[in-house]
Amino acid sequence: MTEAKSYKDTVNLPQTRFDMRANANKREPEIQQYWQEKGIYADLADNNPKDLFVLHDGPPYANGALHMGHALNKVLKDIINKYKLLQGHKVHYVPGWDCHGLPIELKVLQSLKSSERAELTPLTLRHKARDFALKAQQEQAVGFQRYGIWGDWKKPYLTLTPEYEAAQIGVFGAMALKGYIYRGLKPVHWSPSSRTALAEAELEYPEGHTSRSIYVSFPITQAGEKAAEILAPYIDDLAVAIWTTTPWTLPGNLAVALNPELTYAVVETESHIFHRSYLIVALDLVEKLSETFGVKLTVKVTLQGESLENTCYQHPLFDRVSPIVIGGDYVTTESGTGLVHTAPGHGQEDYVVGQRYGLPILSPVDAAGNLTEEAGKFAGLNVLNDANEAIINALQDQKVLLKEEAYEHKYPYDWRTKKPTIFRATEQWFASVEGFRDQALKAIKEVTWIPTQGENRITPMVGDRSDWCISRQRAWGVPIPVFYDEETSEPLLTEETINHVQQIIAEKGSDAWWELTVEELLPEAYRNNGRTYRKGEDTMDVWFDSGSSWAAVANAKNRPLKYPVDMYLEGSDQHRGWFQSSLLTSVAVNGIAPYKTVLTHGFVLDEKGHKMSKSLGNVVDPYQIINGGKNQKQEPAYGADVLRLWVASVDYANDVPIGQGILKQLVDIRNKIRNTARFLLGNLHDFNPETDAVAYEDLPELDRYMLHRMTEVFTEVTEAYESFQFFKFFQTVQNFCVVDLSNFYLDIAKDRLYISAPNAPRRRSCQTILQLALENLTKAIAPVLCHLAEDIWQFLPYEKPTESVFQSGWVNLDAQWQQPQLAQKWVSLRQLRDGINQLLEQARRDKVIGSSLEAKLIIVDPRTAESGTDEKQGENFVHWFYGWLENFNEPTFDPNDRKISLRNIFLTSQVEFIKSAEIEPSFTYEETVVINLERHDNNIRTKPIKIIVTKADGHKCERCWNYSTQVGSFSDDPTICERCNEALQGNF
């Protein structure tokens, strides 16, 4: 008995060194090293032919390890930058860091012993803070680069460098000389725990804050002119009722504000149980206050709010009389009494009203939050601790406390120390937003906001905001370059002094403010002018630091950037942070927004949609995603591309989830894309596009349909990138790899690729499509899966078109590939194929067949002799479609025949067409497949086509595994079919 002949070496199996596994932890750093050694980013950034695109980096804080928010933000930016590079734009991305401010200062102080803190000078603290910031910045930079982020890493911008600080002084100076900077005693958000003023963006409002709210009666001493007659019967036993959630501010009370549009009532208290028998309250609140006080209130008389103006009352705890004044629409009947306790030193609205009435600014609280001597017997008490208790007790002693109750509400906390803040009037430096508010609002309208609700968020923030307090009482920051006359305390701030300090800081850095004497810091003209000066001790708000980056970076002469820049991209919290501070400084100095487009993203949550916190144990660490955890089996190293794919998969306009379940799904998708590319690479091992590619007009229909499909897919991908909707890229590419390629085209292609003669036209035609799909797919995924794309490119089995995939340009689509009419037929055919696959799967499950090649497919002629009028269009299509199917004859053995048979498409050994009358009962499986037929008027008609699956005829070919009745017909090769016989001779 002769041994069976082996045909293994005659089959064109895939060949590639491209690994099935990503080995990301090893391979990604190698690819990053390759980019660096070849200078890929620098070459493209400088030499691409199209206009410069600048996405200006919002500086993360140089403090602590990177978290998922950093990853989301930086990867989004990098996807956009890499897409722009592939589109041919020059791109200069300068990563930045915010290096000054309280958080770093606190970290330094926490690292010192109490004895060291006591001896700390401002300069020593600054040196330690600088070292801390630089170390954190360098660690973060390494992390960002491991994400695959491209940028000018050798020359980032740091807000602590002399050139940056000097540019910031320049912005401050320009605003000062325009009259937008002033010094004033105003209430500001003050953090007793940090002992400094805070900006709105440095506050947070945690849930669950409870205040001691009180209702208090202030005895009326004299009625105002308009109310005298109405109040006369009650004046000797009358009080005004107020409500406050901050009892500690009562020592600063200088007025009671009302709403002139509201109606107020004099009410009599049942049994006259209070200090005064009659109270003034808002009419709409009488019933509610009766319930609150637990006493019946009877309305005696009503009067309009404006008539109560200038009615006076006695402060219950201090020997002073104050007026009732007209406030604004902030006085409502939603809570309280409709009358608001007003302390101009402890609130912005109170301050504005106080200025209108010429009230003094009384703020008897020191930097630590302790009441001062101006608070009389309450001096020394802390406003956030024991002051409330003492003041409430004193009110009770005076019998003016109407009610106390716990009140849960949102209250501002210091975002760093996590402790409550207060409003406190202090001498501060302000930017007068009022001076350029209208310009800022106009500039907002000229910006493209993505998503569009971003404009709706920032507009009221700018429209309603008060002047910007830009001074801080800390050492680690850029100094406000002001001098004070020793005799009068008048500030000295002129063009000459600002320019002189700016030049010094440009040369020596801001430490010079502390190192040099006043004489050295002053221009010569001010050194001997008969006056003596002292340096100011305030530093600038860090939001002024980062808000000046458009001047220090984008508009810097030593950087190849531009101003305004194309895009700012940060989290949605930056509408009140960096987006706003940048807008205000740029508009104040130049009258324009510093950006053309602003894109915002949400926050990262855990898999269940909860906020991440160490206490909950639900923190996902980007470092661990990339490098794996301690137990690599439970927490494997997924690499940066999986992290980047996650960013592209989510709708970042909202808050986005991440967790192990999501990551595992993304790994599967990354692997599917990788394995698709590996198949393409492996089947191009002997293909040279220069000599082997088949011209479009010579391609069979299936291949031309796939080119049409590529135009659809990669046009959608391009639109996804252009609209910054990367989740659409994610869905489209995933679908293309799995549905169009793996499950359809490549499934069909294996027969042509493996079985045909190596140089057969039908095989070369298929390889032409594979090569175009591979290169376009690689380019399309490159902005997101940058390491995988480069890995694929480096393993191209023919001469690479360019050194790096990023030098190859964007996807290459030919207009002639678009063939919608051709596509319509193939869409219907794919629907038919899906139905056939289900029937084959059923036969497999029942073990009637193993492989689909063991089956013969029978298609029953759906054409009828007559058609009704309504169905005529659909019937005509069915006639034509069935006829088209019948034309898929077996290809001849002419070497130039590139036809694809239906059995290849359906992956069966035979396909047969029969009339319905010919159906025999022995047929095994029968099903009706409904296909959608698109009419000329775009209406859809559904038509059924009957299909039958039965056992294939003949015997199995040992080479291609198809069944054929001609197996055994060839004496030299008795175990192969007619196709394989011709293929071995080079004819098929």
Swiss-Prot record:
Short sequence motif 'HIGH' region: positions:
60-70
Higher taxonomy: Bacteria, Bacillati, Cyanobacteriota, Cyanophyceae, Synechococcales
Q: Where does ATP bind?
A: K614
CDD domains xref list: Anticodon_Ia_Ile_BEm, IleRS_core
**Name by which UniProt lists this protein:** Isoleucine--tRNA ligase
**Keywords associated with the record:** Aminoacyl-tRNA synthetase, ATP-binding, Cytoplasm, Ligase, Metal-binding, Nucleotide-binding, Protein biosynthesis, Zinc
| Annotated HAMAP family | Ile_tRNA_synth_type1 (MF_02002)
- The listed location of motif 'KMSKS' region is 611-615
Which cofactors does this protein require?
A: Zn(2+)
Identify the EC number(s). Answer: 6.1.1.5
Q: Read off the Pfam families from this record.
A: Anticodon_1, tRNA-synt_1, zf-FPG_IleRS
Taken from the UniProt entry, a GO cellular component term is: cytoplasm
